[in-house]
Amino acid sequence: MTNSSIDSKSDLIRRDPVLGSRRLSNYWWATVILVGASGFFLVGISSYFGFNLVPFIKSEEILFIPQGLVMSFYGVAGILLSVYLWLTIIWNVGEGYNEYNKQDGIVRIFRWGFPGKNRRIDLVYPIQDVQAIRVEIKEGINPRRVIYLKIKGKREIPLTRIGQPLTLGEIEEKAANLARFLQVSIEGL
């Protein structure tokens, strides 16, 4: 393959990776919740049996009903939440890519989901059905900056990752580059 064929292929195919659940914040929260919930659960169980399972807390002084029972309940709930977070990290839910292929005339939005019948989420549309790129910007306490792909006769498909919002400059640049590549208009700016 020559350099010119590589360059022409990159002019025809664009693939943007999308980060899934394997983000630093998910690892952090899954670990913190597991450690905290395990502590609650151990203190609750210690109050039931009347001896310390956690050496630096005097849990035999805690009455099982109601404090120990409530702590055990919160511990179990926290452990279950942590297991859920760890499973989404292991399965890498949400990871995938957005592919725009002028060569084959398709737009493919691919994501990994939860195990089961719909594990692979693969949306394929003809590239000529793309109407526009829409940008949604909401400021405030919970800012939202999302790029959407508008498809004829279908609902809008979000293309940006969830998590830390992009800066205004980054979102404008990404939307403009994508609209230029697909040769469609930008809405919402």
UniProtKB/Swiss-Prot annotation:
The chain crosses the membrane at residues 31-51, 70-90. Keywords: Chloroplast, Membrane, Photosynthesis, Plastid, Thylakoid, Transmembrane, Transmembrane helix. Coiled coil: none annotated. InterPro entries: PSI_Ycf4_assembly. GO terms for cellular component: chloroplast thylakoid membrane; photosystem I. It is a multi-pass membrane protein. Pfam families: Ycf4. It is found in: Plastid, Chloroplast thylakoid membrane. Its main location: plastid. PANTHER family: PHOTOSYSTEM I ASSEMBLY PROTEIN YCF4, PTHR33288. Seems to be required for the assembly of the photosystem I complex. This is Photosystem I assembly protein Ycf4. The gene is ycf4.
